[in-house]
């Protein structure tokens, strides 16, 4: 197991960067704190009986039992299923390198499938052909009896340590805003049959965008939203996919994050996630470093081709993606973007997740559906 950083450091990083988002999505802070105190975290002995993966797997199972009770209302069952999906995802992160983590991901997918009937919107699995493989996506659609035209559509993707099921909480906000949403795994994560490769090599995202455009959704009303490495792909696709009308980039690496100096400083958690996504031995991050240097968006795409609205978000104290990468999009790429920087916050601004996430979704709705799509007087530059 990767252990070049102390266990205490890794657990503190987890508490700082992940706990605020998990709590906002329904996790109990007390249980998270107890898990940190009792386990070695997701990197150290996670499969032992009282290890991280095993503990959260049991929590998810308990919630599933409660969610299946016919005595509960539909809203109660939906909430319990969502929290089970959350806990199974926590058990799995940041990669499926152990048997219990792989089991946790299997249960997360099963929980998501079982919960579809109780969600207040339609969700179905989509298989998008690409070569001899399929892109697996979760397609969300609002239930709007009076809707005459198909809704706006958003392609949603996460980073190296999350799955499309983990992105359910953002997807549910998107669909509640009246938009359709296709959530897919970043290559190298979840059910993706591809490994992480630079733009120009990977055709996964352009294919998913064309699929959305071809479903009958207005090709002039398609957006893309990504968190972490998913933000990287939002920017790359904005420069290369003419179907997109707006993109949101939250915490995406752009250029300086791919420097040798920055990559060498990455915590073990992210080393494991990136190595796994690229198909390398998780214990040998040096191979990944040698390749990641070629991912800079200043080298792989022409950012000057971006002509759609861009919203970039991050915390100023991000230890994973230097805050300079948020500004370099405009300074070096010449992109006119809105910038939401949260002072003192970390990677993807987790302490302000409850603020930026719904606002960013509303921003997207207004950009691809019209300024009055979701009236929000507070949608102003921070």
Mark where each language-model region is.
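Hydrolase active-site cap/lid region
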Residues: 236-291, 308
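Alpha/beta-hydrolase active-site loop
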Residues: 166, 173, 195-220
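Catalytic histidine-centered segment of alpha/beta-hydrolase-like enzymes
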Residues: 344-357, 375-377
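Short beta-strand/loop motif that positions the catalytic acidic residue
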Residues: 306-307, 312-314, 318
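Conserved alpha/beta-hydrolase "acid-adjacent" motif
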Residues: 319-325
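Catalytic histidine neighborhood in serine/cysteine hydrolases
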Residues: 331-348
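N-terminal cap/lid segment of alpha/beta-hydrolase-fold proteins
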Residues: 55-56, 60, 97-149
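Short beta-strand element of the alpha/beta-hydrolase
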Residues: 148-159
